[in-house]
Design a protein with these regions (language model features):
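Short loop/turn segments immediately following beta-strands, especially the blade-tip
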Residues: 24-31, 70-77, 115-125, 172-181, ...
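A short beta-strand motif characteristic of beta-propeller blades
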Residues: 34-40, 79-85, 128-137, 183-190, ...
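Residue-level detector of Asp-centered blade-edge/turn motifs that repeat once per structural unit
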Residues: 50-54, 96-100, 150-153, 203-205, ...
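Beta-rich catalytic cores
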Residues: 17, 44-46, 90, 143, ...
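Loop/turn-rich, solvent-exposed surfaces of beta-rich toroidal or solenoidal domains
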Residues: 246-313
Length: 348
């Protein structure tokens, strides 16, 4: 049996309708999603990740300053372990390190990344290291929107937005698992108006793809994993050239073998597909597909990459599709999961 955990925004300020974390059982025979739990949590469990052994789930509480841990029970449901304060406001991303001893959190308005020790029982312990993202002036910050590992989990990419006072950038850190410390190796700064949001790392660890929220674009960068350096090589739009309206690019994702890159567009309510040249890393736009809903903040493949999902935050739907890597085409399976204000999906 496989499971899906859906983080749902909950607050009136976010115009949200969710109640917390939902657990679903997914039938291996039919693919049907069956809700088995709705765990009411602290506000806005807006992003979550499992530890490497998949025994525990960790969730950040958007717009607040807390991070929570949960035990995954034998029946797939969640039980509370603990919640800690990190100090930085609006944690937006969380990921385990390669040793499974730490969870790393990016806080947007906190302008920082926090390395948190995991206790033996799966609960969250103390913060052992904090990396602050400096802004343009003393006391200003750059807004950390994502912290994600390279494929070897030796380097941490921290994607930051400027929001007038900081820098739109990717800061690269080398990670020391002995003490959880981070040492900067590079800093790529994007165009002033782009507002970088998320990156995806190719399986070969040499190609990095950055989706830019305000620029509505995708940037390709090469990565040297011997010294932790980035170099920008290409930029393509995420919106069709016949579309003249507003847009807010959101998430990026690579297919299993790294041949297809996908980006999601809010307001335009679509995904864009690119084919990746496996020798050079350059992108070629393949086409656009509606997400059949409003505000596709989050996109994901399931565990074996056989199915693709777009979480439409403002229409309360998760839309299932299937990617053919050979042709680079998406097809709709017809399955739509209805859940309130979905903003993150974790498969187990």
């Amino acid at each position: 049996m496989s499971y899906a955990y859906v983080g749902c925004r909950t607050t009136r300020e976010r115009n949200a309708r969710g109640k917390g974390l939902k657990a679903y059982e997914i039938s291996e025979a039919t693919g049907e999603w069956k809700e088995i739990q709705c765990l009411e949590t602290l506000p806005n469990p807006s992003y979550q990740a499992m530890d490497l052994e998949e025994k525990y789930l960790y969730s950040v509480h958007g717009d607040n300053t807390q991070v929570s841990s949960y035990k995954i029970e034998a029946d797939g449901t969640l039980s509370d372990l603990n919640t800690i304060e990190i100090g930085g406001k609006n944690p937006v991303f969380i990921t385990p390190d390669r040793t499974n001893r730490y969870m790393v959190v990016a806080a947007l308005q906190g302008g920082a990344v926090y390395v948190i020790r995991r206790n033996a029982d799966g609960s969250l312990g103390e913060i052992v290291h904090t990396a602050h993202m400096a802004g343009k002036k003393e006391g200003a910050i750059s807004f950390a929107h994502q912290c994600i590992w390279d494929q070897k989990k030796e380097y941490l990419f921290v994607v930051c937005q400027a929001r007038l006072q900081g820098y739109g950038q990717i800061v690269v850190f080398r990670f020391n698992p002995e003490d959880g410390s981070l040492t900067q190796t590079d800093c790529y700064r994007g165009r002033e108006y782009d507002e970088p949001r998320h990156v995806s790392i190719h399986p070969n660890n040499r190609f990095v793809y950055l989706i830019n929220e305000k620029g509505n674009s995708m940037t390709y960068l090469s990565f040297d994993d011997k010294n932790g350096k980035l170099k920008a090589l290409q930029v393509l739009p995420t919106l069709p050239d016949t579309y003249t309206g507003e847009g807010q690019a959101s998430a990026s994702l690579l297919s299993k073998n790294g041949e297809i890159l996908i980006g999601s567009n809010r307001i335009h309510e679509s995904i864009v597909l690119y084919r990746i040249d496996q020798n050079t890393g350059y992108m070629k736009e393949l086409g656009y597909y509606p997400t059949l809903g409003l505000t596709p903040r989050f996109i994901s493949f399931n565990r074996d990459y056989s199915l693709f999902y777009a979480a439409n935050e403002d229409s309360d739907t998760i839309v299932e599709m299937r990617l053919c890597e050979e042709t680079g085409r998406m097809e709709y399976t017809g399955r739509i999961i209805h859940t309130e204000s979905p903003v993150c999906i974790t498969f187990r």
